[in-house]
From Swiss-Prot:
The lineage of its organism: Bacteria, Pseudomonadati, Pseudomonadota, Gammaproteobacteria, Moraxellales. InterPro entries: GreA/GreB_C_sf, TF_GreA/GreB_CS, Tscrpt_elong_fac_GreA, Tscrpt_elong_fac_GreA/B, Tscrpt_elong_fac_GreA/B_C, Tscrpt_elong_fac_GreA/B_fam, Tscrpt_elong_fac_GreA/B_N, Tscrpt_elong_fac_GreA/B_N_sf. Belongs to the GreA/GreB family. It comes from the Bacteria. Keywords: DNA-binding, Transcription, Transcription regulation. This is Transcription elongation factor GreA. It comes from Psychrobacter sp. (strain PRwf-1). Necessary for efficient RNA polymerase transcription elongation past template-encoded arresting sites. The arresting sites in DNA have the property of trapping a certain fraction of elongating RNA polymerases that pass through, resulting in locked ternary complexes. Cleavage of the nascent transcript by cleavage factors such as GreA or GreB allows the resumption of elongation from the new 3'terminus. GreA releases sequences of 2 to 3 nucleotides.
């Protein structure tokens, strides 16, 4: 079984989405299909076909979330030993050595990644280049814009 690392917040968000899909979206789509069936000929019934397509997307997402939750490896960074090392779940402050610009990122699971909110996937190039390093270490990371050197300023376990 594949393991899916996620923070407690990411796990809760997936559970909430699953609940929404099962208790709100699925019944709404089922009702829409039933209503569209009442309109007669299903071959040329656009409402029916649209609702069936929506049902397929909904059921696929439910299966995807259930698989991820069954393989979830919930890691709470607040409970990790505070060794100053970059690991999954921590928030890391890094400085671009060329521009001296500092950035703050939390390393999270794939489903939690949100670059606009400074949450990067554990599988992203930046996270892969930082994992295992400690405060004060430098990391050379290949980004889409080229090779960038960062210094790890601070590792926060929260």
């Amino acid at each position: 079984m594949q393991r899916y690392p996620m923070t407690p917040q990411g796990h809760a968000a997936l559970e909430a989405e699953l609940k929404q899909l099962k208790s709100v979206d699925r019944p709404r789509i089922t009702a829409a299909i039933a209503e569209a069936r009442e309109h007669g000929d299903l071959k040329e019934n656009a409402e029916y076909h649209a609702a069936r397509e929506q049902q397929g997307f909904c059921e696929a997402r439910i299966r995807d979330i259930e698989a991820k939750l069954s393989g979830a490896q919930v890691i709470d960074p607040a409970t990790l030993p505070r060794e100053g090392r970059v690991v999954f779940g921590v928030t890391v402050v890094i400085e671009n050595l060329d521009t001296e610009e500092q950035k703050r990122y939390q390393i999270v699971g794939d489903d939690e990644a949100d670059f606009k909110n400074n949450k990067i996937s554990v599988n992203s190039p930046i996270a892969r280049g930082l994992i295992g390093k400690s405060e004060g270490d430098e990391a050379r990371i290949e980004t889409p814009s080229g090779l960038v050197e960062f210094e790890i300023i601070e590792v926060i376990y929260q």
